Amino acid sequence: MARRIWHAPVAEKGAADPARLVSSALDGHIPCIVITSTPESMTQTHTTDLLVIGAGPAGYTAAIYAARANLKPILVAGLQPGGQLMITTDVENYPGFARGIQGPELMEQMAAQAAHVGTQIIHDIITECTLKGHGGAGEPFRLVGDSGDVYLARSVVIATGAQAKWLGIPGEAQYQGSGVSACATCDGFFYRGRTVAVIGGGNTAVEEALYLTHHAEHVILIHRRDSLRAEKILQDRLFAHPKITVKWNCVVDEIVATGTPPVVTGLNLRDISSGTNEHLAVDGVFVAIGHAPNTAVFKDQVETDDEGYIVTNPGGTRTSVPGVFAAGDVQDRIYRQAVTAAGTGCMAALEAERYLAGMSH
């Protein structure tokens, strides 16, 4: 993969002008970010006070604060710039947008703001890193991109996010944003008075089902076994709730949608005990089989918990390695919201600034 650098629209003399990108964004006209490739043979070494890894709300916010602190940050965008919000349609719970905003549009505006204040945004994927024993007054942290580029940084913010686990069934990817979701907190509002299904049997599924009762008229929990894995107290709440029913020993073979544009209208189920098939009419489906943090490249470099989430100090973003900070869903196994991710991105940048200031004295 060639390295790619994100550019703002080009001014008449050929110079990149991030201010024009932001001005256009603020006017409500969100431009595409032009991506140009660099030949594989032209690898580079980038040196910075702060390297931000990840281009979601946490990463962009960290970059904005770092740039305003004159840390001249470099942001490595990763495989999916914009993160999970790039597959989210209406975002109605992010402050500042009275009528809501499209997920991709929100991320375009964040990218524009980060570029405007001086962040260098590079489209690359970190594939190797050396964090232990580096940073601070010693050798800089060394990271390598898929492009072959080397990144040397005095401090690092890891904001690579997490991904919802999916079933991989027909209709699931196709109808995301049209009735298929993995976040009840994000999308439950759209199903007021409707019937929705939740797929899963652990804490995540039960919590999603309970949350959805605040909006939906009927919530159907679908589980492939005859008992739940969720904590007993959550199960008690689930079974006692009049809006919730459970379909046991069932798997979803297909998510069905109709209309133009298509919206989810039902699920094709299969009873794994009897082998019988059933069509279940629903207005939406929430896949709740857990999340997986994007931390594979940092394994054995920073401390992680049993699910792979990066461990940070209570109430902060410091990791087990001084000078390395973590923000957003990569260290948040509870909230997983755009606004909380942005908040921890701010915290990480402020903590990195203080860390670097301490190194200079």
Residue ranges, per PLM feature:
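A Rossmann-like FAD-binding core segment of flavoenzymes
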Residues: 46, 114-145, 150-153, 213-314, ...
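Beta1-alpha1 glycine-rich phosphate/pyrophosphate-binding loop at the start
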Residues: 44-117, 206-232, 239, 305, ...
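FAD-site-proximal beta/loop scaffold in flavoenzymes
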Residues: 163, 168, 174-190, 288-335, ...
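Residue-level detector of alpha-helix initiation sites
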Residues: 56-57, 80, 162-164, 203-204, ...
